[in-house]
């Protein structure tokens, strides 16, 4: 068994076949400069760590939560001229979110918590557009 059975990337398939996961947590960061003192992965590292801690606490209280692998690319159109600040368009983010939500819903997940770690990611309008077409409940943590 994984030391963190609530983190998908660290969990082997046999443990997942009967896990009964009802809550999926999707950390979403960005890869961009943070002045001279912080690494490009700051937004991703923070959202990943905070999502895992939240899932740990939920797991300890009996919730069947699972943290999905963190999406490391955000929307940072204002940093397109900076070296190695790869980003996604909002339409690409929405397509990723839509596809994952439908896939998770098909697998019986009841709630998808989007854990946003980057100020340039604007998910509220996307969630409002996607929610009516889903049985799965979308939640946003900014």
What are these regions (language model features)?
Residues 57-63, 132-137:
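Short helix-capping segments at alpha-helix termini
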Residues 30-40, 78-85:
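Glycine-/proline-rich flexible loop or hinge segments
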Residues 1-38:
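Active-site and ligand/interface coordination hotspots across diverse enzymes
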Residues 43-56:
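Short catalytic helix/loop segments, enriched in acidic residues and glycine
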Residues 4, 70-142:
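Active-site histidine-anchored catalytic micro-motif
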Residues 18-28, 63-75:
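Short coil-to-beta-strand
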